[in-house]
Amino acid sequence: MVLDSSASWEPGDETADQSELLPEIARGVPLIKVLGVGGGGSNAVSRMYKDKLPVVEYYALNTDAQHLFRCDVGHRIALGQNLTRGLGSGALPDLGRQAAEESRSEIQQAVEGADMVFLAVGMGGGTGTGAAPVIAQIAKESGALTVAVVSRPFSFEASTRRKNADDGIGKLKDYVDTLITIPNDRLLELNRDNESTFTWEEALKMADSVLHQGIQAIAEVVTIPGEINVDFADVKTILNNAGPAWLAIGRGKGENRAIEAARQATKSPL
C-alpha cells in the first residue's frame, strides 16, 4: 500500500520533489530516490526530509504501520499489509523478505524512472534486514545506480541481532552497486568526550544521523553546483559495481576549511 503525503508544486516552491517540478526545471538533473527501509532506515530518511533537496524523492518503507505514519517523508509504503497486517515483522528477517515480495509492485512503482536509488537501512531487525535485498534487487533491475548505506548493530546488542545483520549484509551486497557499512561501535569513538553519559537513545539517533549524512552528502554532490563540477556520470563511473565502500566524515571552517575537513575525514573512526 502506497501512502503519498507529498504536496503539489507551485511556482516559487523549491522544496517539491523532482517529479513535481516543471519539465524545463527538471531537465538535465538526475532523478535520485532515497528509500528508508525498516525502523532505522525510515528514521534516517525522516531526518533527511527535514533538510530535503528539491530534486530528490524520499520514501519510508516499513511493516510497522504505527511507525510508518509517524514518519514525516514525501512518500510512505506499507510493506506486506496482508502478511503482517501493519504489526511489524517481529524481528524476523524472513518475514521482512516476504513482506517486500508481497509489495513488489509498489516498490517497482517507487523506483521507476530513477537514475540513482539510495537505500538507508539499520541492519539486524526484521524488516530492514529481510526486505532490503529484495528492494535493492528491484531497484537494480530497473536500471538505477543502486547504493546502500547500512548500519551494523552495536557489539552490546543481542547476538541474534548481530547475526541477522551479518546475514542480511551478505545477501544485500549481491544486489547493489555500492555497499557502505557503518559499524555502530565506531560511532562511540566520535562521542568519546561524553561516553560515560551516552544514552541508548542518543546512540540510536547518532546511528540514524550518520546514515543521513552519508546519503545526503553524495546526493548533494550531483544535485548542487559547486566550485568543482561533479556530474552524475562521474559519480556513476565511481560507484557502478564498486562493491564495498567506506564512509568518513570531516568538518572544517575558515579559509582552509576544505583541507581541514579532508584531514579530519582521513582520521575518521568510521
Tell where the protein language model's regions lie, with residue ranges.
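Tubulin/FtsZ superfamily GTPase core signature
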Residues: 1-270
